[in-house]
């Protein structure tokens, strides 16, 4: 346990940030999974809507500093590629 007052405060803020980032990453994984399920089911309209929603969530995560912009771009690109491979 830290003895310095500022370090005790940082422990609290770091824990809050960790939980916030964990919630954001969890939401990203959920949206990605929903998208992949729709693609596997062959629902093109649903997959397109889910792709837009997931892309928006990735952009929000970048804005909040949870993900690096290149990481989000890579994930969005992979999802778009999967969507475009649907017949």
Swiss-Prot record:
**GO terms (BP aspect):** translation
Q: What are the GO cellular component annotations?
A: cytosol; small ribosomal subunit
Q: Which UniProt keywords apply?
A: Ribonucleoprotein, Ribosomal protein, RNA-binding, rRNA-binding
Citing just one GO molecular function, the answer is: structural constituent of ribosome
Disordered as annotated region, ranges: 1-25
**Compositional bias (Basic residues):** 1-11
Question: rRNA-binding: present as a keyword of the record?
Answer: yes
Lineage: superkingdom:
Bacteria
One family name in Pfam for this protein: Ribosomal_S20p
Q: Which InterPro entries match?
A: Ribosomal_bS20, Ribosomal_bS20_sf
Protein purpose: Binds directly to 16S ribosomal RNA.
Which NCBIfam families does the UniProt entry name for this protein? S20
Protein's name according to its UniProt entry? Small ribosomal subunit protein bS20
User: Gene name, please?
Assistant: rpsT
